Amino acid sequence: MLLSVLLQAAAAGVGLSKLGAALGAGLAVIGAGIGIGKIGGSAMEGIARQPEASGDIRMNMIIAAALVEGVALLALVVCLLVLFL
């Protein structure tokens, strides 16, 4: 299936860089979603085990989620640059 997509892209004159940019953007979004899901799940588990530490756990969860989201945004920007330049 992937070979047929690559052959169609090559035949249509679309560069493989555009296909790679789309694939990279998709993988970046999927990775960020998985990462933020794991962060949230682990934070909820930690709060369930130690409710008195919920403030610290929540703060660390928000910082980690922001870092994961920042990396995903950077990956999307790089993919868009490859796509349009």
UniProtKB/Swiss-Prot annotation:
Q: What SUPFAM superfamilies does its record include?
A: F1F0 ATP synthase subunit C (SSF81333)
Against PROSITE patterns, the record matches this protein to:
ATPASE_C
Record's bilayer topology term: Multi-pass membrane protein
Instruction: List where the protein spans the membrane.
Output: 19-39, 62-82
Q: One Pfam family of this protein, by short name?
A: ATP-synt_C
Q: Where is the signal peptide?
A: none
Q: Which domain of life is it from?
A: Bacteria
Protein localization:
Cell inner membrane
Looking up InterPro entries in the UniProt record yields: ATP_synth_csu_bac/chlpt (IPR005953), ATP_synth_F0_csu (IPR000454), ATP_synth_F0_csu_DDCD_BS (IPR020537), ATP_synth_F0_csu_sf (IPR038662), ATPase_proteolipid_c-like_dom (IPR002379), F/V-ATP_Csub_sf (IPR035921)
Record-marked site positions (Reversibly protonated during proton transport): 69
Tell me the function of this protein.
F(1)F(0) ATP synthase produces ATP from ADP in the presence of a proton or sodium gradient. F-type ATPases consist of two structural domains, F(1) containing the extramembraneous catalytic core and F(0) containing the membrane proton channel, linked together by a central stalk and a peripheral stalk. During catalysis, ATP synthesis in the catalytic domain of F(1) is coupled via a rotary mechanism of the central stalk subunits to proton translocation. Key component of the F(0) channel; it plays a direct role in translocation across the membrane. A homomeric c-ring of between 10-14 subunits forms the central stalk rotor element with the F(1) delta and epsilon subunits.
Family as reported in the entry's similarity comment: Belongs to the ATPase C chain family.
Question: What's the protein here called?
Answer: ATP synthase subunit c
